[in-house]
Amino acid sequence: MENRASGTTSNGETKPVCPAMEKVEEDGTLEREHWNNKMEFVLSVAGEIIGLGNVWRFPYLCYKNGGGAFFIPYLIFLFTCGIPVFFLETALGQYTNQGGITAWRRICPIFEGIGYASQMIVSLLNVYYIVVLAWALFYLFSSFTTDLPWGSCSHEWNTENCVEFQKANDSMNVTSENATSPVIEFWERRVLKLSDGIQHLGSLRWELVLCLLLAWIICYFCIWKGVKSTGKVVYFTATFPYLMLVVLLIRGVTLPGAAQGIQFYLYPNITRLWDPQVWMDAGTQIFFSFAICLGCLTALGSYNKYHNNCYRDCIALCILNSSTSFMAGFAIFSILGFMSQEQGVPISEVAESGPGLAFIAYPRAVVMLPFSPLWACCFFFMVVLLGLDSQFVCVESLVTALVDMYPRVFRKKNRREVLILIVSVISFFIGLIMLTEGGMYVFQLFDYYAASGMCLLFVAIFESLCVAWVYGAGRFYDNIEDMIGYKPWPLIKYCWLFFTPAVCLATFLFSLIKYTPLTYNKKYTYPWWGDALGWLLALSSMICIPAWSIYKLRTLKGPLRERLRQLVCPAEDLPQKNQPEPTAPATPMTSLLRLTELESNC
């Protein structure tokens, strides 16, 4: 199937015209940027994919789902879904030289909704993910003290049920069912001032508001100059967390009880593989930790030079990401093993996931260490950096998509900076609802529904179908060969064609069947309207794909067959193997002649 001439107008619509060059200097449009070198791209992607999930989610899932046995489903999903989709999105951005929306428009206009779905997810992610940074900053600032404030029960926010840390053989009576620890009271009564439900949002926590404002200011100045500033910032934000992680790892494995914790982390329980939930956890973890279906990889790849070897980069980055998750497990569970031994309780009682690990379990363990404020500062500084580069790359993804949709509007001097400011301000004000006394319940809604594995799996199904079956896996492989000089491992193509959509569809259907309404802390049940709001958040992204396809089919003129032909044909100015890249803009006359020639063929 040949290509059909098409182009992009200033308002973002696709029309069948002859290719035009993106660089339009006459109207003041700036040339699209590129990375100064490969290292900036690699570190930017590493900063995006290596985030909080590597530290607070993967180790817990590994322990929960059979220890070392969990690596079997994890590796299967890694090679059938993770690496293929990761490579697909990165190569797509590099090939089309476009962001997360227009890249899909240029290879298959009927599936442009994939881009809108991914940007809807990343927009919601931008609102709530940075709230974790606000919490981490609050803890970081609270750590600059001689005695950590969550280490004792002598503060004004503590209750009479507060029981300080102690070993099991201490004489104090701790049998009360209402007994709580100072770290939990610090988290719920000092940091969050948690209300009794989502129906009681209460007042704003102004200390957290200032922390959120600081986080957004840092995020803004990390990307305000585009890849020129992002490429420099990631040299620090993407590498320094590794230093912190190594320091915490060395400290953890030298503690008494560390071996017990690591044993719980890795000891294989093969019988857990018969539980379908283990496989679903492995699949969703791959999508979470590899930043798949968010448009971020497409945006970052679009700033590569055309002949960059993105295949080699993607394989190396995927290995780095999984290795980091594995190493983080040693750092976390060595500390949890120490805490388990010190308190004389089973490790199952101290193992936590998500915010519970970062703001309850680990702070509790830190108090037991000598020089505890130092280790608290190291840990929360690492959390801030891990979350920061993931956050600003997500914002960069959204901004890149908008700029590429409307280049004549935003690709002009200082307008991009204004756009980033607008996105940051809007996201900041929406995020304030999560800093109220009931804000934690709203945060959990966003985390459970808005960027859930269900949404990401749904988008991944259509991504693989679009590239492999509509655009053509063979054609895309030829495009990749034209870029990097050779064809990648053939298994990746077959994953796009068969394994990836099948595995994603099966996991998606299973997640629907096994769906359980959200609860907070296994105690609070959300009202019906809370779950309804959550489903609206989830559907807001998934509905974009079918809705866009129906909209384009209804608005285009002509017979259905002709409309379908126009909507599945890629842009004419996309470079093809053994064909020279376009070197000059087309005129209206050549556009008309070209359209006549291609009237019956794509």
From Swiss-Prot:
<feature type="glycosylation site" description="N-linked (GlcNAc...) asparagine">
    <location>
        <position position="178"/>
    </location>
</feature>
<feature type="topological domain" description="Cytoplasmic">
    <location>
        <begin position="549"/>
        <end position="602"/>
    </location>
</feature>
<feature type="transmembrane region" description="Helical; Name=6">
    <location>
        <begin position="282"/>
        <end position="302"/>
    </location>
</feature>
<dbReference type="Pfam" id="PF00209">
    <property type="entry name" value="SNF"/>
</dbReference>
<feature type="glycosylation site" description="N-linked (GlcNAc...) asparagine">
    <location>
        <position position="173"/>
    </location>
</feature>
<keyword id="KW-0813">Transport</keyword>
<feature type="transmembrane region" description="Helical; Name=11">
    <location>
        <begin position="490"/>
        <end position="510"/>
    </location>
</feature>
<protein>
    <recommendedName>
        <fullName>Sodium- and chloride-dependent GABA transporter 2</fullName>
    </recommendedName>
</protein>
<keyword id="KW-0325">Glycoprotein</keyword>
<feature type="transmembrane region" description="Helical; Name=2">
    <location>
        <begin position="68"/>
        <end position="88"/>
    </location>
</feature>
<feature type="topological domain" description="Cytoplasmic">
    <location>
        <begin position="1"/>
        <end position="40"/>
    </location>
</feature>
<feature type="glycosylation site" description="N-linked (GlcNAc...) asparagine">
    <location>
        <position position="269"/>
    </location>
</feature>
<feature type="transmembrane region" description="Helical; Name=10">
    <location>
        <begin position="453"/>
        <end position="473"/>
    </location>
</feature>
<dbReference type="GO" id="GO:0005369">
    <property type="term" value="F:taurine:sodium symporter activity"/>
</dbReference>
<comment type="function">
    <text>Mediates sodium- and chloride-dependent transport of gamma-aminobutyric acid (GABA). Can also mediate transport of beta-alanine, taurine and hypotaurine and is the major taurine transporter in hepatocytes.</text>
</comment>
<feature type="transmembrane region" description="Helical; Name=8">
    <location>
        <begin position="366"/>
        <end position="386"/>
    </location>
</feature>
<dbReference type="InterPro" id="IPR000175">
    <property type="entry name" value="Na/ntran_symport"/>
</dbReference>
<feature type="transmembrane region" description="Helical; Name=5">
    <location>
        <begin position="233"/>
        <end position="253"/>
    </location>
</feature>
<keyword id="KW-1003">Cell membrane</keyword>
<dbReference type="GO" id="GO:0016323">
    <property type="term" value="C:basolateral plasma membrane"/>
</dbReference>
<dbReference type="GO" id="GO:0051939">
    <property type="term" value="P:gamma-aminobutyric acid import"/>
</dbReference>
<feature type="transmembrane region" description="Helical; Name=7">
    <location>
        <begin position="319"/>
        <end position="339"/>
    </location>
</feature>
<keyword id="KW-0812">Transmembrane</keyword>
<feature type="modified residue" description="Phosphothreonine">
    <location>
        <position position="587"/>
    </location>
</feature>
<feature type="transmembrane region" description="Helical; Name=12">
    <location>
        <begin position="528"/>
        <end position="548"/>
    </location>
</feature>
<dbReference type="GO" id="GO:0005332">
    <property type="term" value="F:gamma-aminobutyric acid:sodium:chloride symporter activity"/>
</dbReference>
<dbReference type="InterPro" id="IPR002981">
    <property type="entry name" value="Na/ntran_symport_GABA_GAT2"/>
</dbReference>
<feature type="transmembrane region" description="Helical; Name=1">
    <location>
        <begin position="41"/>
        <end position="61"/>
    </location>
</feature>
<feature type="transmembrane region" description="Helical; Name=9">
    <location>
        <begin position="418"/>
        <end position="438"/>
    </location>
</feature>
<dbReference type="GO" id="GO:0016597">
    <property type="term" value="F:amino acid binding"/>
</dbReference>
<dbReference type="GO" id="GO:0005886">
    <property type="term" value="C:plasma membrane"/>
</dbReference>
<keyword id="KW-1015">Disulfide bond</keyword>
<dbReference type="GO" id="GO:0006836">
    <property type="term" value="P:neurotransmitter transport"/>
</dbReference>
<dbReference type="InterPro" id="IPR037272">
    <property type="entry name" value="SNS_sf"/>
</dbReference>
<keyword id="KW-1133">Transmembrane helix</keyword>
<dbReference type="GO" id="GO:0005308">
    <property type="term" value="F:creatine transmembrane transporter activity"/>
</dbReference>
<feature type="disulfide bond">
    <location>
        <begin position="153"/>
        <end position="162"/>
    </location>
</feature>
<dbReference type="GO" id="GO:0005283">
    <property type="term" value="F:amino acid:sodium symporter activity"/>
</dbReference>
<keyword id="KW-0597">Phosphoprotein</keyword>
<feature type="transmembrane region" description="Helical; Name=3">
    <location>
        <begin position="121"/>
        <end position="141"/>
    </location>
</feature>
<keyword id="KW-0769">Symport</keyword>
<keyword id="KW-0532">Neurotransmitter transport</keyword>
